[in-house]
Amino acid sequence: MNFFQAIFLGLVQALTEYLPVSSSAHVRIVGDLMLGGDPGAAFTAIIQIGTELAVLLYFRRDIWNILKSWCLCLAGKEGKDRASRFGAHNKDARLGWYIIIATIPILIAGVLFQHAIETTLRNLWITVAMLFIFGVILWIVDDRARQVKTLDDMNTKDAIWFGIGQMLALIPGVSRSGGTITFGRAMGYKREAAVRAAFLMAIPAVFGAGILEAVKAIKDVNADAMFPGWGATIAATVVAFVVGYIVIIGFLKFVSTYSYKAFAIYRIALAIIVAILLLCGVLSPLEGIPVSGNA
């Protein structure tokens, strides 16, 4: 992968990260078409840090209020009893706890199935299946779901379900925002609330994965044949940050007016196109993916 290819993949990452269309699937597919192989889990995870930095910037006030309230409650400033420490009387502190709870499923699955995530699950046929299946599910759920809940209505059970939706996004093609949004809509959350939950809950998971992959790359920079080098990777991450911030603004305006049907249709259409390309031999389902036996 050269410098300009890395930049282009950073652009693809930014344009698709926040939409329920799976950025990892797009980076994987575009990488295969452009490079003849998978760009790699390390590069993908690191450039996702750029898009999450855009989330930090856009939601900086919300994040600050959540962190401040969570710390104050934990320190007993809102009351010494257990309920107060866990945010019983402070909605921002409660949301902080729910974000932590929602992060646990993806953390556990990421550790237990790391090798499969980096190898077997990056098979393009799996990506095609997930694009199609979750496209259909998103369409049905968004069309039939009620719009009654906001983030103030969240409880522990909802946070766990949000976390499960986010955990499924470890499989390319599901989409981190798509999984979280779909589960949120199924629980009756308004579209805007489901999107905000998806953005906020992704921060710990994405930063954690990106930092871990960066550490691994530093330890053995030659382990990934597709890794373009740190200069190109950092440049791609910056592109993902700048373009990603613009996409956040546009996406939030879109969901305040329209449904997710357009994204569901896009997912289904993309799945069909990629399946045809695979059947015709234009794309290879396993090209560039490390052999799963090399644990």
From Swiss-Prot:
Catalytic reaction(s) noted: di-trans,octa-cis-undecaprenyl diphosphate + H2O = di-trans,octa-cis-undecaprenyl phosphate + phosphate + H(+)
UniProt keyword annotations, A-Z: Antibiotic resistance, Cell membrane, Cell shape, Cell wall biogenesis/degradation, Hydrolase, Membrane, Peptidoglycan synthesis, Transmembrane, Transmembrane helix
UniProt GO BP: cell wall organization; peptidoglycan biosynthetic process; regulation of cell shape; response to antibiotic
Protein topology in the membrane: Multi-pass membrane protein
EC numbers, comma separated: 3.6.1.27
InterPro entries attached to this UniProt entry: UppP
Pfam families: BacA
Record field: transmembrane: 39-59, 97-117, 121-141, 198-218, 232-252, 263-283
Cell location: Cell membrane
Signal peptide (residue range): none
GO molecular function: undecaprenyl-diphosphatase activity
Disulphide bridges: none
GO cellular component terms, A-Z: plasma membrane
Domain of life: Bacteria
Its job: Catalyzes the dephosphorylation of undecaprenyl diphosphate (UPP). Confers resistance to bacitracin.
UniProt record similarity statement: Belongs to the UppP family.
Additional information: Bacitracin is thought to be involved in the inhibition of peptidoglycan synthesis by sequestering undecaprenyl diphosphate, thereby reducing the pool of lipid carrier available.
Protein name: Undecaprenyl-diphosphatase
Organism: Bifidobacterium animalis subsp. lactis (strain AD011)
